[in-house]
A protein has these predicted regions:
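A conserved beta-strand element that flanks and buttresses the S-adenosyl-L-methionine
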Residues: 127
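A short glycine-rich, Lys/Arg-flanked "PGG" loop and its adjoining helix->strand segment in the class I
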Residues: 139-154
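Short catalytic micro-motifs in class I SAM-dependent methyltransferases
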Residues: 130-131
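Class I SAM-dependent methyltransferase SAM/SAH-binding core
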Residues: 65, 69-115
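A C-terminal cap/extension of S-adenosyl-L-methionine-dependent methyltransferases
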Residues: 170-172, 202-206, 216-266
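Conserved class I S-adenosyl-L-methionine
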Residues: 2-59, 73, 94, 156-182, 239-240
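Acceptor-substrate binding/catalytic loop of class I
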Residues: 187-203
Length: 266
């Protein structure tokens, strides 16, 4: 399963199937690597993700898995830190692209996020980035991630935030009916008719506790995700500023991506 088409054009090329009555976003008919990343001017977003991951992932990991990791976009961040690394995704196309680039350095597994093929406590650490917006049942996903982590294992999870400043202004000025202060997830079906979920930080943080995780660190990521800002200031300047504010701005939870470093406690 892959997770990250954020435009109408992208979602139009993605099939949706059902698994145990849950929607699965199938990127097999969509070249996520080329269309969404390589040809779409998202260098800033990519570097912002990498900045956060370098801060949050453990320096040394025995058995690591990148959940819904697509074609291995972030593999160069975790391969040097892991004795063994696995890339898990629903899309066979994404996994084929990963194997072409990384070969035997990265183990690839295809499957359903709601019922992964992994053993209880198999991994010491995991990463999940740009995935939560496709989950019909986030709690079930978190319980599955908890199951495959060993006791005390680390999970670095990115969450699509509904409580951003632009969304607040759109709501205040009646340009959007989506209430960013409502703690329930918003389902933005105008982006994807089968569901495109954004989450209130309080909602996901309660879910983390409910599903056996403790929050150890939080970062505010992609704080300057704006075509206008990228055009005016350029990627290099924005990333320099991004590095400076990811930690300090975490307390207000206003960025489109919120990164959490979690520990499995039960």
């Amino acid at each position: 399963m892959k997770t990250s088409a954020t435009t109408k054009d992208a979602s139009a090329n993605i099939k949706n199937t059902k698994s145990d009555h849950k929607v699965i976003s199938d990127y097999n008919g969509y070249n996520y690597k080329k269309v969404f990343w390589e040809d779409s001017g998202r260098e800033y977003e990519d570097l912002a993700d990498r900045t956060a991951i370098r801060r949050l992932l453990p320096k040394n990991m025995d058995n690591f898995v990148d959940i819904c990791g697509g074609y291995g976009r972030l593999a160069n961040e975790y391969l040097p830190r892991a004795k063994r690394a696995t890339l898990f995704d629903y899309s066979k196309l994404n996994l084929e692209q990963a194997r072409e680039e990384f070969g035997d350095k990265l183990h690839t597994v295809q499957g359903d996020i709601y019922k992964t093929p992994f053993s209880d406590g198999e991994f010491s650490a995991l990463l999940m980035v740009r995935a939560t917006h496709h989950f019909e049942n986030l709690e079930q996903v978190l319980r599955e991630l908890n199951r495959i982590l060993e006791p005390g294992g680390v999970a670095v999870i990115e969450v699509a935030n509904k409580r951003t400043l632009p969304k607040m202004f759109r709501y205040w000025f009646k340009r959007s009916s989506v209430n960013p202060f409502d703690k329930q997830p918003s389902n933005l079906k105008e982006i994807d008719k089968d569901g495109f979920y954004n989450y209130h930080p309080a909602y996901v943080e309660d879910l983390f506790k409910k599903t056996g995780f403790e929050i150890m660190d939080v970062l505010s990521v992609s704080n300057f995700r704006s075509r206008t800002m990228k055009k005016i200031f350029g990627t290099k300047a924005l990333i320099k500023l991004e590095k400076a504010v990811q930690g300090p701005l975490a307390s207000v939870r206003f960025a489109p991506s919120i990164y959490y470093r979690l520990i499995k406690t039960k």
